[in-house]
Amino acid sequence: MREHKRKYDMLAIVGPTASGKTSLAVDVALSVSGAEIISADSRQVYRGMDIGTGKDLDEYVRGGAVVPSHLLDIVDAGEKYNLFEFQRDFLAVYDDVKERAAFPIVCGGSGLYVESVLKGYRLLPVPENPALRESLEEKSLEELTTILSQYKTLHNNTDTDTKKRAIRAIEIEEYYRACPVEERSFPQINCLTVGVDVDREVRRGRITRRLHERLENGMVDEVRALLESGITPEQLIYYGLEYKYLTQYIIGELSYDEMVKGLEIAIHQFAKRQMTWFRGMEKRGVHIHWIDAMLPREQQVEMIKDLLYD
């Protein structure tokens, strides 16, 4: 049986938002003995942030069969979870999965998170730099993005859709310039990386439909409940995208139509940045096997299994 001839230690399934990568990962996991999913999503770690992040725990259930999942709902909303913490938590889960002779499937759209474990870069907690922050505060998001684009290292953050996150990303870059670090002792992971390739216009249509579905299914109420729980508008706006725009709508900074229009544009731009990151991963030496998102699911699963086994 090909179950005994697996060629890889781990499978990574990546793709932009609305590509269907999570449901594909679940279907692959159900057809691979002992498979468990490790989420690589920078926002699905937060409890209570479900609709806005596209986190649907029911998606991990198929006909009564539950696929074990990790790194979902591990941090309280309002806190800030970073790449260093993800690497730490990933290694703990990865070691546990391997010790139990299970098979890890990493799935997510945060290319930075995925690449950080595939390449094994050492990351340290980065302290705040008040002087640098003050010097950057007057710059626009566009100017900050231009500054970020000049850095060549792995540590750039593709989720910089707010000034605060862009400034933090620059702060991290400057810290690593001043305090270079060596690679940490990551396990050597022989990983098969699969990308879900979705046509740009198809992706745009899915994003638009999904946004309106989420708005109809309680996303505004979700954000309102987070605010009522004591989380400040500033804390929610930090997370960007849905939480930024819906918070601005709820506190009266945007009309409903302005919120929907602005958010839709921002999500399209985010998906484009995700794809740019994945293409960059390829240039940095990560081989990604691209699979057409429009193929029948059974065919997608078989293609991945053909790559996974001898």
PLM region spans:
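Phosphate/pyrophosphate-binding catalytic cores of soluble transferases and nucleic-acid-acting enzymes
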Residues: 1-310
